[in-house]
Regions:
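Metabolite-binding pocket within alpha/beta catalytic cores that recognizes anionic/polar moieties
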Residues: 1-151
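Structural motif
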Residues: 17-21, 68-72, 101-104, 120-122, ...
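Glycine- and other small-residue-rich loops at beta-strand/loop junctions that grip anionic moieties
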Residues: 80, 148, 152, 181-185, ...
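Polyanion-binding loop/helix "lid" in catalytic or ligand-binding cores
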Residues: 144-155, 167, 181, 193, ...
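Active-site/ligand-binding-proximal alpha/beta "capping" segment
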Residues: 160, 165-202, 267
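A C-terminal functional module that forms or caps the active site or interfaces directly
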Residues: 187-232
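His/Asp/Glu-rich mid-to-C-terminal helical/loop segments that flank catalytic regions of hydrolases
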Residues: 232-268
Length: 268
């Protein structure tokens, strides 16, 4: 299926991307920064799942951003939509086969750190997988990666240092911490937020981890950035909605675009 998907994309474009980008909830507008050479709906790529979530357009963009050849997923997939981690990881395998060696992932998340605010960006230093499964479960294809990939540096330290430098130079507030992935689609209870915080997580979301595990399995370097869209403090918890989450994510897009653009400009 990977080969079929790669052939379908290559039939539409000859661009060989350096960098792959996955845009999460409310962040599709960042795709407007891409000088698009080719636009391919997911439904026209064999094996690609289809996005069913509001604000996930469901198309692959090939073009340039900040002087780099990029392939960008405008919309991603989630376990709560009924997809397995293997389904979610397949597009990453396609992006890597198209030529991308670096993966930039973004997401909207709930913030559990008491000193962080809505709209802040957080550099993902590490993650906790509470999805209950893993994209590498099942027979391993040694052509794609090792049976037991090391995850001690899932989020590349060099890319994180680069992002910190860009944020400092451009005056962008950039936190750094641990992302925990849960299945959703419901938001968490007060007790669950307390548990996740005790485990060492700073933010919580419903995506990203399957794609990152898949990318690391294939030898890609990964940079992850979360936008904190709601504050998940158990003792001061207020109801929120998807509409509010999307609005905060979109409000933070200029900062995310500036950060991503700066990182791309400085990549070796």
């Amino acid at each position: 299926m990977i080969d079929e998907a790669v052939r379908a994309v290559r039939a539409r474009t000859k661009v060989v991307p350096d960098v792959a980008i996955i845009l999460g909830t409310g962040l599709g507008g960042l795709a407007d920064e891409v000088a698009v050479e080719t636009r391919i709906p997911y439904g026209e790529i064999p094996g690609f799942p289809l996005s069913t979530v509001e604000s996930h357009a469901g198309e692959l963009l090939v073009g340039t951003l900040a002087g780099r050849r990029v392939v960008a997923m405008r919309g991603r997939f989630h376990v709560y939509e009924g997809y397995t981690p293997q389904h979610i990881g397949l597009p990453v395998r396609v992006l890597q086969r198209l030529g991308a060696r670096t993966l930039l992932v973004s997401n909207a998340c709930g913030g559990m750190h008491p000193l962080w605010n809505r709209g802040d960006l957080m550099l993902i230093a590490d993650h906790i997988n509470l999805l209950g499964s893993n994209p590498l479960v099942g027979p391993n294809d040694d052509r794609l990666g090792p049976r037991f990939p090391d995850m001690s540096e899932a989020y590349d330290s060099g890319l994180r240092a680069l992002a910190r430098g860009v944020a400092l130079e451009r005056g962008i507030t950039l936190r750094e911490g641990v992302y925990v992935a849960v299945t959703g689609p419901n938001l968490e209870t007060r007790a669950e937020y307390r548990m996740l915080r005790t485990m060492g997580a700073d933010v919580v979301g419903m995506s990203t981890v399957p794609e990152v595990i898949t990318a690391v399995h294939m030898g890609m370097k990964v940079l992850g950035v979360s936008i904190i869209t709601d504050q998940c403090l158990p003792d001061a918890l207020a109801p929120t909605s998807v509409e509010q989450i999307i609005a905060v994510a979109r409000g933070a897009e200029p900062a995310l675009a500036a950060l991503v653009g700066g990182v791309l400009e400085r990549l070796n």
